[in-house]
């Protein structure tokens, strides 16, 4: 069976968490010059996004494990790939837009709205439609207010809902240069209260995992704040 432990692999001086014995991740290793290399480029452009990818992977797999009975049509490998590479499309966003502290101009927001599409496009060729759609839909919201397609609840699969919660949770609990950092408990409770946007069951599961210590802040965190990013 697949290990439940998520070991740490060093890529340069940045930690990327991944499941070493999953076939999907052995496949990723074979394409180090493409997807892994793009993550390295993202690290050079925007360190927050790189670290964020590893955190979203960790949280998404914890949620997957807790909700495994509902994930019969979704493999843990596919969830892991979609979570790790959900933001890989950001490699096409100019750094001045990623790190801009003030409101973006309409001509600039198109880059932000585009990145899930680029992530899906880059993943589809190597990992198939299911992984691509999951990554592409992580900014969709249940009430149709998300992007890039403005999908409604019935059109957003559970894997994408899980990554959406994991993505928002990490953004709320990590300093990005312009935000107030929330505690893990505060962030999880707030997400439970946003059930018009995020899946209630996923958010409630996250809160349970925070309360029981399955998801907790690492003892050794970097103390220097990251540059602001989208």
Name each model feature, range by range.
Residues 18-41:
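Sensory coupling linkers of modular signal transduction proteins
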Residues 2-26:
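Ligand-binding loop in jelly-roll beta-barrel domains
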Residues 36-230:
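Histidine- and acidic-residue-rich, metal-dependent catalytic cores
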């Amino acid at each position: 069976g697949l290990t439940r432990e998520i070991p740490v692999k060093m890529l340069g001086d940045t930690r990327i968490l991944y499941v070493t014995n999953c076939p999907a991740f052995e496949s990723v290793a074979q394409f180090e010059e493409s997807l892994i290399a793009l993550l390295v480029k993202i690290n050079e452009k925007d360190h927050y996004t790189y670290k964020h990818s590893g955190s979203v992977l960790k949280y998404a797999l914890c949620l997957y494990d807790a909700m495994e009975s509902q994930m019969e049509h979704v493999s843990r490998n596919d969830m892991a790939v979609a979570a790790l590479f959900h933001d890989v499309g950001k490699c096409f966003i100019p750094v001045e837009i990623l790190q801009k502290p003030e409101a973006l101009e309409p001509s600039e927001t198109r880059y932000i709205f585009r990145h899930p599409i680029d992530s899906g496009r880059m993943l589809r060729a190597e990992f198939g439609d299911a992984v691509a759609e999951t990554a592409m839909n992580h900014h969709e919201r249940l009430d149709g207010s998300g992007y890039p397609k403005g999908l409604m609840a019935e059109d957003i699969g559970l894997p994408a809902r899980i990554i959406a919660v994991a993505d928002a949770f990490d953004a709320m609990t990590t300093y990005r240069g312009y935000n107030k950092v929330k505690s893990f408990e505060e962030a999880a409770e707030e997400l439970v209260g946003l059930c018009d946007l995020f899946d209630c069951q996923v958010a409630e599961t996250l809160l349970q995992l925070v309360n029981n210590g399955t998801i907790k802040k690492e003892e050794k965190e970097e103390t220097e704040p990251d540059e602001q990013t989208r």
